[in-house]
Amino acid sequence: MDLLSYQKGDILFSNCQTLVNPVSCDGTIDSYLSKRFFMRYPAMYTKYLQFCKEKQLTPGKLWVYQGKTKNILNFPIKEISNLVPQPKVVKASFMRLAETYQDRNISSIAFPRFFEPNLFNDGAEIQKICNDFLSILSIPTVVYTDYIPHSKTLIPLITKLVGVLSEEEKK
């Protein structure tokens, strides 16, 4: 059985036990995904700000927030928010995850794609780091390659079950 899979969709609706929230270490939310995580888990946002202010969230130091139904792994990918993901930070975080995921009782994990090979200079290097580390995890691992809002996946299902929706019903 292949433990690593790739899919399109909304990571917040993943069946995995642990969801990865890529963060910067300075307490700034600079991605739509992080904003969605922190809106869904406001107590996590408060702790995130505190940890960043106290310099407790650093490259290679992971923080698992335990939600009611999911665990959220706050995963540093850059030190300062206005930077692109930094290979050394991503590698340090993956190394720590590989060393500790069993001790943290992570049984399955979902990652967003936080690298874009052609978008910035280090994209290909970050993609290689991700692929190398993801392939050694011995738990089910899902990488969400493209964000598709959950509503976009439900509409075809509803259409199949009850027929075509009007424009008003789709909203």
Where are these regions (language model features)?
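Macrodomain-like recognition of ADP-ribose-binding/processing modules
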Residues: 1-171
